[in-house]
Swiss-Prot record:
Keyword DNA-binding annotated: yes
Domain of life assignment: Archaea
Quaternary structure and interacting proteins, as annotated: Homotrimer. The subunits circularize to form a toroid; DNA passes through its center. Replication factor C (RFC) is required to load the toroid on the DNA.
Disulfide bonds: none
GO biological process: leading strand elongation; regulation of DNA replication
First and last residue of the signal peptide: none
Organism: Methanothrix thermoacetophila (strain DSM 6194 / JCM 14653 / NBRC 101360 / PT) (Methanosaeta thermophila)
Keyword DNA-binding included in the entry's annotation: yes
PANTHER family: PROLIFERATING CELL NUCLEAR ANTIGEN
Keyword line: DNA replication, DNA-binding
Protein's job: Sliding clamp subunit that acts as a moving platform for DNA processing. Responsible for tethering the catalytic subunit of DNA polymerase and other proteins to DNA during high-speed replication.
GO molecular function: DNA binding; DNA polymerase processivity factor activity
Protein name according to UniProt: DNA polymerase sliding clamp
Length: 244
């Protein structure tokens, strides 16, 4: 059972953070909120999303699972104006999700959860370097890096966080000392990542006041942030191998 009311923009932002990587997901419904974990088809990136019950204006649920087509859900949510509320009601017998926006009511057919790719096991990584920066600053750096290359290096040396992108002709480098960051745990780190993935992720990251980056040497990058109203998002992105 699920009955809930939530701000349309809050739900749209949460869904966008996931739909940049996958089209279909299995939501786990709990009394504490909605959760999901998913991996992209190429097994390069993972995403974890948790929408706390406190993010909803009204939330009543019993434990269960539902499979959702995020493309269709996003399309329906695009009908809601800023400031509008979205009403959600699970029709268990019909295996549908009723979505209400203003005077409109839609029914979204659900997917059998067993038909959706199994949730990934998110590895527990003890990455040495932690950096916290404004989401908008990270988004701007990623957009700038895209202009010169299709990959970017993220690293930490001493008290400096840096991002480097090199193309055939042009190059870009961002450096920020610990005093310019929101927070920092120094540690030797340097890894190369695909800008295709980071660009998709950064659309949601740019809306967060603060984003935490956890980096190692040729290790996956963990990106954690919170969108408004208690929506928790975490990405894990596999590194690329640097060519000598």
């Amino acid at each position: 059972m699920l009955k809930a009311v939530i701000d349309a923009e809050t739900l749209r932002d949460a869904i966008e953070a996931v739909s940049s990587l996958v089209d279909e997901v299995k939501f786990t419904i709990t009394e504490k909120g909605l959760e999901l974990k998913a991996v992209d088809p190429a097994n390069v990136a993972m995403v974890s999303l948790k929408i706390d019950a406190s993010a909803f204006e009204f939330y009543q649920a019993t434990p269960g699972e539902i499979g959702v087509d995020l493309v269709r859900l996003s399309d329906l949510l695009s009908m809601a104006d800023r400031g509008e509320r979205v009403r959600l009601e699970l029709l268990e017998d019909e295996r549908k999700l009723r979505i209400g926006v203003g005077s409109l009511s839609y029914t979204l057919s659900l997917i059998d959860p067993s038909a959706i790719r199994k949730e990934p096991r998110i590895p527990e990584l003890d990455l040495p370097a932690h950096v916290a920066i404004p989401g908008a600053e990270f988004r701007r750096a990623i957009k700038a890096a895209e202009k010169v290359s299709d990959h970017v290096v993220l690293g930490v040396k001493d008290d400096i966080f840096y991002m480097e992108a090199k193309g055939d002709i042009d190059a870009l480098k961002l450096t920020m000392r610990s005093s310019e960051l929101l927070d920092m745990k120094p540690g030797e780190a340097r890894s190369l990542f695909s800008l295709d993935y980071l660009s998709d992720m950064s659309k949601s990251i740019g809306k967060a006041p603060e984003v935490k980056l956890e980096i190692g040497i040729d290790y996956p990058l963990r990106i954690s942030f919170m969108l408004k109203d208690n929506v928790h998002v975490s990405y894990l992105l596999a590194p690329r191998i640097e060519q000598e």
